[in-house]
Amino acid sequence: MLKPFKIPESVLVVVHTAALDVLLIRRADAGADEFWQSVTGSKDALDEPLAHTAAREVGEETGIDALGPDCALTDWRIENLYDIYPRWQARYAPGVTRNREHVFGLCVPRDVPVLLNPREHSDFVWLPYREAADRCFSPSNAEACLLL
């Protein structure tokens, strides 16, 4: 069965603590490359609310309940429009070359457990926000970290 094409509208969720340490996760599909990033993911349906996409992706990628009592999910009201990386172009319908990314923040307790989905990510690290920005492969992700 063929997978449906991805919707070119996604979220970027900067997971951080009150002390401004940022959770970065390493992509498992990046081969030998060091693709560190925050939580990202596309909408599952055109009418899926962005906050739902953000909470769902955080749960799928890290095991963190973004709507839990000790967490605060915030829509930063920032949109980035960028060219889809060539290595991931085939996931989108023919002719789709750009993605609209919506930025969220998620403040979590420092001791929140992280449970990665090994099909998507191979490692995680908590870093002070400036160091996290330096490690991100995506410029929009780095900029979002620096907004903390």
Describe the residue ranges of each PLM region:
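Short secondary-structure boundary/capping segments
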Residues: K3-F5, V14, P94-V96, L115-N117
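Short connector loops at helix/strand junctions that flank enzyme active sites
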Residues: P8, S38, T97-E101
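Active-site beta-strand termini and strand-to-loop segments that position acidic
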Residues: V15-A18, R27, L106-V108
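Active-site segment of metal-dependent pyrophosphate-handling enzymes
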Residues: I64-V112
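NUDIX/MutT-family hydrolases
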Residues: H102-L146
